């Protein structure tokens, strides 16, 4: 079974207790999603999860006074906590979360990409984890990062997957997807882990660069010419 598959069951159907992603009568004990294997996610019917988590491996080098190390992200839940695999608490810059190590998070607005302090459900973002030899080691984030939310009493709302997940900018759209999309000439993908074309990895959106993975976002023109630089 795909690691990001959600299974809906009635209470009279028994499955091993160690299984995740099982929804009984509208409630899931634990939902575990991952970027590994680039498997899709789809929620056909809303439910509540007592705990939900998504794991992503960040490896890129970020810039120092220049754009680099960016990638995109979209998640199906409002993120409450971000944790590095070594236990460090992470949070977007200016979040004012005590003892958290900061990372960059930006949403697309009519004015362009702007810094934000929360990662909300079904909203496309660009994201970068500080990772550069010039930074203090305590601020470098390299490896697996878990985005999670938890509510054992009322549950975390997981809504039906929208038909479209878009934010509109001054001349282009940023669209999130939970499915893989084949590369084509109408969409621009960020050059994650790709130093070719004369640009540093994670610095530009390039047309037809590669396939889109689930939980990623892509740029498309909005009636005007699209510039590739973040």
Where are these regions (language model features)?
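Intrinsically disordered, low-complexity transcriptional regulatory regions
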Residues: 91-95
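Structural signature of tandem-repeat unit edges
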Residues: 1-12
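A short, polar beta-strand/turn micro-motif
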Residues: 12-88, 110-230
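Polar low-complexity intrinsically disordered regions
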Residues: 96-98, 195
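Short linear interaction motifs
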Residues: 99-114
